[in-house]
């Protein structure tokens, strides 16, 4: 079977999406006029994401990238979520495609987007820039709530991060899983093309026998909380994304909102500990600002110099050889 050559370009855009520990938990299949995105459960994070919630949020990020790339290439895309969690995207070449400026602006952000784990420069994001970005991503199912340092929720969320760190850093399964996804040097990173590389973590390029015990010793609540407090203090806002339901459809919808946060040079990084620890997540759900919605993603926003980019597996390695349904 032959496929349009630009289908590979669409998948190239899709795999630039973020994922927990850069696990890249997706696989693709090609049909004559469709692409499917399926969860790759062999890459699931059973300790930090036992319900696969963040896995499906990552698939939503990949889906958004793919659909934006499809529109850029002149395709109309229609998505359908199957019961098994597979997303089927029907693609129809438009004879006279009209490119929408807002879609093109987002498409341009795909290669620029990164999870920036650095300390930010402390400059506030002007509300005149932030408000339209957030408003454009609001929907009937997903809402975005930004809190400046002066808001009481900012302190509440900071404390939730601290509590989440304390829970996770005292969980041997969490730490073992995290260590398994750390790539300790350039050779290690090049061999797997996934995981959390030493470079994106701001660590030196050292042999694993040196860096592994150092990083293992650093995985403790005191050090993590000190680091996160400083990074939160350097940020302009904390952003909590919530949804009306807690199921794969709304998790996908949540993921589709994240690319927009790259606009105007805004940096972002995940502080999702309180959404990952059940007790903390239940407390966040009680925040009046959420209006009864379910918290899905917590990020910090601000400005920072770009960090090294995480690697991605080659496109051919994430495409199944069987025909898409």
Model-found features: residue ranges?
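Acidic, surface-exposed loops and disordered segments
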Residues: 1-325
């Amino acid at each position: 079977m032959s496929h349009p050559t630009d289908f590979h370009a669409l998948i190239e855009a899709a795999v630039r999406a973020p994922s927990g520990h850069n696990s890249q938990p997706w696989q693709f299949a090609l049909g004559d006029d469709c692409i499917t995105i399926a969860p790759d459960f062999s890459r699931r994070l059973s300790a930090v994401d036992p319900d696969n919630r963040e896995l499906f949020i990552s698939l939503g990020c990949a889906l958004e990238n793919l659909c934006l790339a499809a529109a850029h290439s002149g395709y109309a895309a229609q998505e359908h979520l199957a019961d098994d969690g597979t997303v089927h995207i029907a693609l129809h070449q438009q004879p006279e495609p009209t490119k929408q400026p807002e879609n093109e602006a987002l498409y341009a952000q795909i290669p620029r987007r990164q999870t920036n784990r650095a300390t930010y420069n402390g400059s506030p994001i002007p509300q005149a820039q932030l408000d339209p970005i957030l408003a454009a991503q609001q929907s009937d199912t997903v809402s975005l709530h930004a809190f400046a340092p002066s808001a009481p929720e900012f302190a509440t969320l900071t404390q939730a991060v601290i509590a989440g760190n304390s829970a996770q850093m005292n969980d041997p399964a969490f730490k073992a899983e995290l260590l398994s996804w750390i790539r300790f040097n350039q050779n290690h990173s090049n061999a797997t093309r996934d995981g959390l590389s030493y470079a994106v973590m701001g660590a030196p390029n050292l042999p694993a026998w040196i860096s592994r015990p150092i990083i293992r010793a650093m995985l403790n609540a005191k050090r993590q909380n000190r680091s996160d407090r400083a990074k939160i203090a350097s940020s302009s806002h904390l952003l909590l994304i919530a949804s009306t339901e807690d199921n794969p459809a709304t998790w996908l919808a949540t993921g589709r909102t994240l690319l927009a946060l790259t606009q105007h040079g805004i940096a972002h990084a995940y502080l999702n500990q309180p959404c990952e620890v059940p007790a903390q997540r239940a407390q966040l759900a009680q925040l009046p600002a959420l209006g009864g919605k379910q918290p899905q993603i917590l990020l910090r926003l601000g400005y920072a110099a770009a960090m090294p980019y995480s690697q991605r597996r080659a496109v051919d390695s994430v495409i199944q050889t069987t025909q898409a349904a």
